[in-house]
Amino acid sequence: MSRSKTRQGKLPALGWNTWNAFGCDIDATKIMTAANEVVNLGLKDLGYEYINIDDCWSVKSGRDASTQRIIPDPDKFPDGISGVADQIHDLGLKIGIYSSAGLTTCAGYPASLGYEDIDAQTFAEWGIDYLKYDNCGVPSNWTDTYTYCVPDPGSKATNGTCPDNKNPAPAGYDWRTSLTAERYRRMRDALVSVDRTILYSLCEWGQANVNDWGNETGNSWRTTGDITPSWPRIAAIANENSFLMNHVDFWGYPDPDMLEVGNGNLTLAENRAHFALWAAMKSPLIIGTALDSISQDHLAILSNKILLKFHQDPVIGRPAQPYKWGYNPDWTFDPAHPAEYWSGASSVLGGTLVLMLNSEDTTQRRTAVWKEVPELKDVLGRQGKRRIGFRVTDVWTGKDLGCVRDHYSVELESHDVAALVVGRAC
């Protein structure tokens, strides 16, 4: 995407989206309620800024016969999308919209394939700041010649491979030449041509080897199929995304899908682990729960200032990375047990972010050994044989844990995560 108009898109997006909370049951009132809650709950002050309308916002029967524009549903949006955009902008927030790189959206509404220029211009005139662009409704003449391996559970994924893929591309095939890549480039070109900066979020489910071309096409790109508010799905997506961290840096972010914090029957520990992993991976953090009924515990997770500072670091674009798998041998692809030990440098925290995950179904002890953490090895090496420690802060409580030598151990309940800032030597 063009980076010349503004600095927008340098850092991973923060916001809220209708889909995980409401599906198709949306209207202007629900969206403005969410926007006002982003302000009232203090989320705007923490950097959350996008209020995104997902699928089902338009008239389903078709486009305007004379202009060929998509028509906002007048029952859901009496003042149109532009009316909602004006109200959201008045709050100091930004607004997002949804379409698909096909003939219809995933819910069967008019989509943008073949209408990219018209829709980009329409979105710009309405004051849109963000486009989520899905992958539904693709006609046969736009179907790729080959099938790319996205090792989601449901396929017979073996250590990240897809032995059930009957139509793989030949060795050396350039997926930039695929029809999927072309469909997404067409909307990119249309967005760049309008006189408004619109963040471009590709939602192609990891297909067509998007990690090779996503960053030259959009600001973020989905790496998997859809998330659900269940720990097995969250763990599986975290596992898949953990192998893509070398693609993360300023201006380009693999997207493991929107947040489910506050949804379903996730335990508080699972909500914590979900958010901490997504923040540490510098994924877009798009809230997907009803904010007018959110619990204080869930709000506290979404509002964690230390994780958000790491996520929005203006100097270091690289994410945290796994440095030890823990439950499994290193580099094991396991949907039930993603990498458990992560670390990442920060210019704003005064130290290194370290995560320890308990991926097991029972309470377990996890131990971060300082000499194993890549960011700490240089400091330890300079000290020679002298035994030193580091100042450690608990990310969840903000508590100073003092000068911790050699390692830090903690008992973690099932699917919980310990998050630490390991600071200066002591």
Swiss-Prot record:
Subcellular location: Secreted
Record-linked InterPro entries: Aldolase_TIM (IPR013785), Glyco_hydro_27 (IPR002241), Glyco_hydro_27/36_CS (IPR000111), Glyco_hydro_b (IPR013780), Glycoside_hydrolase_SF (IPR017853), Melibiase_C (IPR041233)
Disulfide bonds: C24-C56, C106-C136
SUPFAM superfamilies linked to this entry: (Trans)glycosidases, Glycosyl hydrolase domain
Gene Ontology cellular-component annotations: extracellular region
Superkingdom in the source lineage: Eukaryota
Entry annotated with the keyword Glycoprotein: yes
Residues annotated for substrate binding in this entry: E204, W205, G206, Q207, A208
Keyword line: Disulfide bond, Glycoprotein, Glycosidase, Hydrolase, Secreted, Signal
Pfam families from the UniProt entry: Melibiase_2, Melibiase_C
Catalytic residues identified in the record: D134, D226
Carbohydrate-modified residues: N141, N159, N215, N265
GO terms classed as biological process: carbohydrate metabolic process
Reactions listed under catalytic activity: Hydrolysis of terminal, non-reducing alpha-D-galactose residues in alpha-D-galactosides, including galactose oligosaccharides, galactomannans and galactolipids
Signal peptide coordinates: 1-13
The keyword Signal is assigned to this record: yes
Enzyme Commission number, as recorded: 3.2.1.22
Main localization category: secreted
GO molecular function ontology, one term from the record: alpha-galactosidase activity
Function: Hydrolyzes a variety of simple alpha-D-galactoside as well as more complex molecules such as oligosaccharides and polysaccharides.
Family note: Belongs to the glycosyl hydrolase 27 family.
PANTHER family: ALPHA-GALACTOSIDASE B-RELATED, ALPHA-GALACTOSIDASE/ALPHA-N-ACETYLGALACTOSAMINIDASE
Full protein name: Probable alpha-galactosidase B
Species name: Aspergillus fumigatus (strain CBS 144.89 / FGSC A1163 / CEA10)
Taxonomy of the source species: Eukaryota, Fungi, Dikarya, Ascomycota, Pezizomycotina
Gene, per the UniProt record: aglB
